[in-house]
Amino acid sequence: STQSRSSAASDVYKRQALSTPENVYGMFSNADLEFKDAVDKDGKKHPLTQGTFIKYLESDDRKLRQSAYNNLYEAYGAYNNTLGSTLAGEVKKNIFNARAHNYKTARERALSNNHIPEEVYDNLVATVHKYLPLLHKYTQLRKELLGIDDLKMYDIYTPLVKDVKFEMPYDEAKEWMLKALEPMGKEYLDVVKEGLNHRWVDVYENKGKRSGAYSSGAHLTNPFILLNWSDTISDLYTLVHEFGHSAHSYFSRKNQPSNSSDYSIFVAEVASTCNEALLSDYMDKHLDDDRRLLLLNQELERFRATLFRQTMFAEFEHKIHQIEEAGEPLTSTRMNEEYAKLNRLYFGDVVETDDHISKEWSRIPHFYMNYYVYQYATGYSAAQSLSHQILTEGQPAVERYINEFLKKGSSNYPIEILKNAGVDMTTPEPIEQACEVFEQKLKAFEKLMKH
C-alpha cells in the first residue's frame, strides 16, 4: 500500500538523518582533514596521514615522534568545537533512541541488544581501576628503559626491544601454530589441519586483494581466511587469530541451525584472542631470550592497547552520555577536561601530559559506535581467562570451551554461553585473571631486560 511505502521511506530518511553526526565525522576525519608533514631529526619531511601516524610514533627518532604527534593534534585541535558538536550530536541521538524505546539510559538500550547486564560494564571499569598501578609500573619501566627524564605521550608507542630479527616463513608458521594449539586437543586440531590442507587460507598478497586479514564464509561453506603474508611474527599471530574465528564459525555452523549459527559481537573476538594467548604461552617457553623479549614487548603493548586503553575509552564514552543525560552542557571543553582526567588516571604521574592529549577523543571513530569499545576489553579478558583454564586444567576446560562455547553459536545469550564455558563476565574474576597475566609478563620482561 501507499501508506506502508511512505512509512518505509520515512524510516530510511530517519535512519539517514540520525546517522548525520557519524557521517560528518567520517568525511571530516578521513577526507577533509589534512596534516602538516612530520619532520625527523635530520630535517627530512614525512607525509603524515591517519595511516602513518602510529608508524611514526613507533619510530626510534624522538624528533619524528614529537613532530607527528604535535602536527596531528594541532590539526584536530583547530576544529575542537566542531568535533565536540558532532560527538555531542551522536550522544544526543543515542539518548533520543533510548528514550523513544522506553529505556532509562542510552547504555541500557545499547547493552540490551545482546542482553548484556549493565553490571558487566561497571565491573570492567572498577576491576581495571584496581590494577592501574600495574600500568603505571609498566610506564615507569618504559621511562627507565628509554633513558629519558621526561616521558611524553608520544613516547608511549615506541618499541622497547630493538634490532631483534625474527623472520617467519609461512611453512614455519603453520608448525608453530599446530604446536601452540596442541592443548586444545584432537577435535580442535583436526579442524585446523583440515583448514590448512583444504585450502581455506589465501596466504599471499595479490593485485586487487584487499589489505589486512579477515575470515569469512557462509552457513554452508567452509570458513575462508584471507592474509597478506610478509614473513613477520605478527603474521603468525594473525594466522592463529583468524583460525580462531574460522574454527569458531566451523563448530557453530556444524552444530547450530542457520538462524543461531552466527555468534554475537560480544564474543566475536574471544576465540581468536584465546588462540593468540595459547601461542604466546607456547612461544614464551620455546624462544631464546632476545626473541622472548621481543614477544613480551609486543604482548605488553597488546594488553595496554586492548585491556587498558579500550576500558579508558569505555569510561569516557559512558561519562559523556551521563553528562548529557543529567542535562549538563556537553561541550568540547568539558570533553577535553574529562578525557584529560582519565588519561592522567590511567597513565599516572610518570607521563608528562600536555594539552594535545585531552583532545584525543576527537580522533577516535569508535565513539560513534554506541557503546561498542568496551567489548574489546571484555572479550580480551574472557579469552585470557579461558586460555588460562585450558593451560592449567587441561581436558575438562577444553571440553567446556569447545562444547559450551564454540559449538553454541548464538543459541543462548552471550553472557550465558561464556558462563557455561567457565567465564562469568558479571564478576571481577576474568578481568583479574587477565590483569594477573599482564603482571606475570611484566615481571618476566623486566627481569630479562635488566639481566
Positions of PLM-derived features:
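His/Asp/Glu-rich acidic catalytic environments and adjacent acidic regulatory segments
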Residues: 1, 7-119, 123, 127-130, ...
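C-terminal, non-catalytic "cap/extension" segments appended to globular domains
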Residues: 115, 144-154, 239, 247, ...
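Auxiliary, metal-adjacent structural segments of Zn-dependent hydrolase domains
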Residues: 161-219, 232-233
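Short pre-active-site segment immediately N-terminal to the catalytic Zn-binding motif
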Residues: 220, 224-239
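Post-HEXXH active-site segment of zinc metalloproteases
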Residues: 249-273
